[in-house]
């Protein structure tokens, strides 16, 4: 979500804001998201919606969909109806298919307001 916001507002990637240093070691994603949302709002931009693809063999996303959407809603200030979450598998291919990794893709729509 953070990188999708940064891309939409034409900023650098997450590593620029939170480099791989001792200061940010084990930092939790919600703590990183807060200043990014602040920058978004400061730029007079609002999020219209998020479309999230969670790519994993297990667990089945459908089991956790509502909980994840509620969490993202709380962290972003978006209405749950503005967040779409889909689960995808890779049919047991690669590290994701072997349940050793999970990937996520996020598409964001934003609008500038005055």
Go through each PLM region and give its residues.
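Active-site phosphate/pyrophosphate- and oxyanion-stabilizing loops and adjacent acidic/basic residues
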Residues: 70
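Short, well-ordered secondary-structure micro-motifs
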Residues: 63-65, 94-97
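Pyridoxal 5′-phosphate
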Residues: 85-89
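RNase III-family endoribonuclease catalytic core
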Residues: 1-67, 75-76
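Short, surface-exposed linear patches
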Residues: 74-77, 106-108
